[in-house]
Amino acid sequence: MSSVSRSKSGLPRLSEPGTGEAGSTPLIRPSAHLLILNDDVIHCAGCPRLVAWRRSVAETKKREFRNEPYWGRPVPSLGDPGARLLIVGLAPAAHGANRTGRMFTGDSSGAWLWEALHRFGFADRPISLRRDDGLTLTDCWITAAAHCAPPDNRPDRAELDRCRPFLVRELELLRQVRVVVALGRIAWESWLRASGWWDRLPARERPAFAHGAEAVLPDGRTLITSFHPSRQNTNTGRLTREMWHSVFSRASKIVSSGEQ
């Protein structure tokens, strides 16, 4: 008999997906496991500093959003469970995803991301401001190195380590991913650690971090790194639209053609 537990929302959780054959645990689709994983993310309270910060921000609010309810909890991942493109961000913005409850929604970084994803065929619209606006992603999954909004937009090392098991589980379920776009140095390192390549590759053989840098890993997946579309980068010209579009143009080409 299969061992069944329940997630914090009451959803059934089976210990491991089975084969569907007699005597095995019932066959569970990866999409179901991703829903359970997202439920676990939402109910995580593992980092006291981040819990206190996201709740404080949700209570005090920003003046322009004072009449809006804030999500104020860990923000789950989103997208197409069969995605071949994986985007790894840093963490929810205090008045962006921490307010709206969806990654890259309601802030300037999201405005850059949705425009690019729509331009290259991964999103059905170029603008998304609310988690209930019907946005649909195709062949793309979005996650982050940390799922809680951190002070000064920077989770510390211990917080990243505590959040990483969620990313490890996610990578195990996203079986079709062929291209990973890491937005920023922290996302780059977090993905390399979660995927195991940080430890398996000698330091001199690890993919380098630089905007537009591209590396094919031993398992055939391609890692592309990009500057994060934060205002610090976009307002100063460190990251331009042309630079930004070049990353997603390249990712789209690899995904659609099988090129490496």
Which residues are covered by each model-predicted region?
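Hydrophobic residues within membrane-embedded alpha helices
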Residues: R6, E16-G20, L223
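Cationic, low-complexity basic patches in intrinsically disordered or flexible, solvent-exposed regions
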Residues: S9, P17, Q260
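A polyanion-binding, active-site-adjacent surface
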Residues: G10-R13, R29-A213, L217-S256
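Ala/Thr-enriched low-complexity intrinsically disordered regions
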Residues: T19-T25, A32
